[in-house]
Each structure stands twice: as C-alpha cells, then as structure tokens.
C-alpha cells in the first residue's frame, strides 16, 4: 500500500513539475500542453513502461527450452518467495547486471545480461535473482519503472526547451534565461527523484533477497564481482538510457562529476558489509 501512495505522489509531483516547466516555456498555453502531456505520460507509464524499458535493452524473453537452467532457477526462487512466475528475459550485453520491472507481482518480469551469467557462479546468480524477486515482492517495480520513464520524459522536455525555446501567450519569445534554467534543472530534478526512491530500497531488496535464497553470502560475493567487472565494461544500453540506471542491481553508469552526486545505489562496500553480517549472525532484521 505504501508503494502505491509513493507512486501516486510521484505522479502528482511529476505532473506539477511538468506544468511549471510548461509555464516557463510557453506561458498558460504551455501549462495546458504540459498538463495534457503529463496525464498521457502517467497513463502510458502505468500500463506500458515495463515493455518500453525491456525494448530499450532489446531484452529477449526466454523459457525452459531456450534457457533451461536460468529459467528453472527463477521459478524455484519465485516459489520460495510465494510469488507468481515472472516473465524471464536475457539481454545480450557483456556488462554484468540485472533488473526487475512490471506494474505488480502478477505482471512482473526479471532480466539479466548474458555477461552476468558468464561472470557469476550458479550460487551467486541465485543471490542476484532473489534480490530482483525481492523488489517484485516489495512492489518496488512499479515506482521504479515509472520513475525511469518519467525521468526520461523530463530530460526530453528539457532538451525541447534548450533547442526550441518557447513563446508566451502573446507569441513573443519566452525568457531565454528561463529556458536555460529549465534545461539545466529538469535533469537534476529527475536525478533527485531517482536518488530519493532508490537507496533505502536497495538495502531492503538485499535483505529480502537474502531471506528468499537463505544465502546472504552468495549475494555479497556476487555484488563484489559485479562491482569489479562492471567497472571495466561499458553498458551501452544503460549509458544511452541513464534514467533506467536506478532499476539495476548495480549502478551501470561510468560518468563522473555531477553524475556521482546523483548515484542511485548505496555504496557497494556497505551493501556487502550488511550482507556478511547477516551471514555471520543468521539474522535478517
């Protein structure tokens, strides 16, 4: 229920932001257009954002015939978590990573790169997929996927402002300084939204995944491997769609500077330390 409230609040906040930006770009007419655009985006994000994200990554659905070991692993973990079987996807990328998407546990999907399957052992891979199923169980996936598409829309709106400027209701050029401010601040607003919803969520998914698999150490060693391998392998699809970075088990972006200020994930070292403490004590609280 709490995630439904957060999702509704996020949609309302994004709608308000769109209206403000629309007003800065085009006055009252811009506000009206922005409101209609935001309502359309809200509808689209709820029903179709998961399909959009999977298409961004050219994810291919697999089954027990095409990826038997991986598919059975997900099915076994979903059973342990008392979840419906999600759709399972593979992404042909060398960078090791994984994510979950969908609007609820009944319409969920999990995806992993071919790179992560090569890098991790079967035990470590179970830890990763248990983490992703914990996101499904906690109903994080709707707000995560909506945030990805909304943040992308904010950036698109900022680019529109930068390249096309705006007109007020009398047809005069809008304040160019306002247009520049929108173009600079909108992506930052999108990044702040992602950061606000992501950090605590990853800790909870680590804990929930450890409970599902019963093996927190496997996720800890998996995170360590992913962190080390991913640092040297660019994830082209993620770099092309940075708004989706917060969906991943590990931040796939390699940029520095301001990008580091908007990191969507807790420090890997802290995540590993918490998991190893769970393994040592046998406690998941």
UniProtKB/Swiss-Prot annotation:
Chief location of this protein within or outside the cell: membrane
UniProt superkingdom: Bacteria
GO cellular component, one term: plasma membrane
Binding site for Zn(2+): 131, 135, 202
Cofactor: Zn(2+)
One MF annotation (Gene Ontology) recorded for this entry: zinc ion binding
Active site: 132
Pfam family, one: Peptidase_M48
EC numbers on record: 3.4.24.-
Compartments where found: Cell inner membrane
Bilayer topology annotation: Multi-pass membrane protein
Keywords, sorted A to Z: Cell inner membrane, Cell membrane, Hydrolase, Membrane, Metal-binding, Metalloprotease, Protease, Transmembrane, Transmembrane helix, Zinc
Residues spanning the membrane: 7-27, 30-50, 146-166, 177-197
Cofactor note: Binds 1 zinc ion per subunit.
Enzyme class per UniProt: hydrolase
GO biological process per UniProt: proteolysis
Cross-referenced HAMAP family: Pept_M48_protease_HtpX
Cited PANTHER family: PROTEASE HTPX (PTHR43221:SF1)
Protein family (similarity comment): Belongs to the peptidase M48B family.
Protein name per Swiss-Prot or TrEMBL: Protease HtpX homolog
């Amino acid at each position: 229920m709490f995630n439904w409230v957060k999702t509704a609040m996020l949609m309302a906040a994004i709608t308000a932001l769109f209206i403000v930006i629309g007003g800065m770009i085009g006055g009252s007419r811009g506000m009206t257009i922005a409101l209609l655009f935001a309502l359309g985006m809200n509808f689209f994000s709820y029903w179709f954002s998961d399909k959009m994200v999977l298409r961004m990554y050219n994810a291919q659905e697999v089954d027990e015939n095409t990826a038997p070991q991986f598919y059975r692993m997900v099915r076994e973990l979903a059973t342990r978590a008392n979840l419906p079987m999600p759709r399972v996807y593979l992404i042909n990328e060398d960078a090791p990573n994984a994510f979950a998407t969908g609007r609820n546990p009944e319409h969920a999907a999990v995806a992993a790169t071919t790179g992560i399957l090569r890098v991790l052992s079967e035990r470590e891979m179970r830890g990763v997929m248990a983490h992703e199923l914990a996101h499904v169980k906690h109903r994080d996936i709707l707000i995560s996927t909506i945030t990805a598409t909304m943040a992308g829309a904010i950036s698109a709106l900022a680019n529109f402002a930068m390249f096309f400027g705006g007109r007020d209701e009398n047809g005069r050029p809008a304040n160019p300084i306002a247009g520049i401010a929108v173009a600079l601040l909108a992506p930052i607003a999108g990044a702040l939204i992602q950061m606000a919803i992501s950090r605590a969520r990853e800790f909870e998914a680590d804990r929930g995944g450890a409970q599902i698999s019963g093996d927190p150490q496997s996720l800890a060693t998996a995170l360590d491997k992913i962190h080390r391998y991913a640092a040297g392998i660019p994830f082209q699809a993620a770099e092309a769609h940075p708004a989706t970075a917060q969906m991943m088990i590990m931040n796939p972006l390699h940029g520095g500077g301001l990008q580091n200020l908007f990191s969507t994930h807790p420090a890997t070292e802290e995540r590993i330390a918490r998991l190893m403490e769970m393994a040592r004590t046998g406690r998941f609280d």
